[in-house]
Structure formats: structure tokens, C-alpha cells
Amino acid sequence: MKKLLILFVALFSIVGTMPGNAASQRTVPAREQKTKRSIMELPLFERAILIIKKFETLHKPKHWPYVGYGHQVQPGESYRRGCQLTEAQADALLRKDYSKFCALYEKYGKDKYLLAALAYNCGPGVVNKSSVLRLLKSGNRNIFKAYTSHCHYKGKKHKGLLTRRLTEFAALFIP
């Protein structure tokens, strides 16, 4: 299953650059040309940031006490109810928060990005009690099933969360 996901991500990133693709046949002025890069070319930290942005989206004032890309406002922080962060402010806050989660799981080396992405969404308390962390601590790298099991909301399996876990696993897990 893991190999199938990795193959899917690789194929998806290649399709946009194929010569027979309709998008590659249209003429685009030089000033508008942008090089398409695969997410897999980016460092793990940047991959995680893009994935979190895609699934969290920029929160609006009605989502209080969440601001930016899913940051939960803590007592003593200067954010006020009804505030809307700019893209730049939200990005900076996301990077700061995600860096803290990466620091929590620093001792897990290359797995810290995957664990930090899960902690950003579920909270470090959930991750610290999870079978994912237990398996990694025991040296077992077969964590696909355990990782993708974190896709429930209010007791029910949530398709969007499953998609998020599959995307995170495909982009951030290094065998």
C-alpha cells in the first residue's frame, strides 16, 4: 500500500510536465512562465508546511479560537476575537508552531516531521500515547496502518482526514 501511494504521488507530479499534456502545449509568455516543481523536491519541513496549509486553510474570524492555519489561541496571546491574520502573518505563525512540534520530536530524527504534522493536527498528547510513537520507539518502521488510523472525528471515520493522513505519509515518511 505504501509503495502504491508513493507511486501515485510520483505519477501525479510527473503528469503536469509530460509533453503530451494539454497544459504543456499552450503558448505562455516568458514573463508568465513558472517552473512546476514537485512537492517531493522540497525539504521535509517545507513539504509539511504546504500540506498543513492545504488542509487547514486560512481560518476566518468565525473560527475563533483558531486563527491563521489552525493555531489555537492560548491565554495571554495578543490575538483578539474577530481578528483576521494576513497570509504572511498566518504563514509565520504556522512555521513557529510547527517548529515547536518538530523540536518535541527531535530525537526521532527523520520521523520528526511526520510526528510533528500529526501533533499539529491532533495535539502532542494524542501523539505521545499513539501506537505510531510506540512502534517507532520499538524500532518498527511499519507504521502505515497506525498512522492512517488517526482519521476519526467525533467517533466516525472522516474522508478528509484520511486523505490528509495519506498525503502526509506519502510526502513525509522516509523508509
Whereabouts are the PLM-identified features?
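Alpha-helical scaffolds flanking conserved acidic
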Residues: 45-49, 109-117
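Bacterial N-terminal signal peptides
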Residues: 8-14
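C-terminal segment of classical bacterial N-terminal signal peptides
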Residues: 14-21
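Structural recognition of the beta-strand scaffold that forms the well-ordered cores
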Residues: 66-68, 114-119, 144-146
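Positively charged n-region of N-terminal signal peptides that target proteins for export
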Residues: 1-4
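A generic structural signal for well-ordered alpha-helical surface patches
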Residues: 9, 113-117, 130-133, 166
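Short alpha-helix boundary/capping elements
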Residues: 120-124
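Long, amphipathic alpha-helical surface segments
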Residues: 21-61, 71-104, 125-175
